[in-house]
Amino acid sequence: DDNSFRTYGKGYQPEERDNWRRENVNKLIRELKHTIVKTKEWVRFGISPFGIYRNKKSTPDGSGSNTNGLQNYDNLYADVTLWVKKKWIDYNIPQIYWEIGHPAADYITLTEWTKMLMTSTCTSGRTWLAR
């Protein structure tokens, strides 16, 4: 990671390494979407990321879910909401394996948060989420 950051992290300060990592993942997702559309525009591209995007306590504006666990954005460098908003992915099926009532990551809390994200960005008015 240190060698890669020194070699390819031009324009980023050492304290911005997380942003550099996220941008590398964003570039992969963006380029995959572009290649798929260019090659076979009818193919749909989706992601099945970890179930927690961000915990509420990690977001300055409180927009994260009311959870307490590993996070896509902060720990895995996956900015899933950006991909949805930029329409780089056609669908998002997070890996939500916690049970209803789980103290750190309640199933209902996570599915409702994901539904809110997808509904607010879905132009067709349809979402994938069913309960």
Task: List each language-model region with its residue ranges.
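C-terminal soluble interaction/assembly domains
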Residues: N66-T67, P94, W98-I100, A105-R131
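Polysaccharide-binding and catalytic clefts of secreted carbohydrate-active enzymes
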Residues: D1-W88, Q95-W98
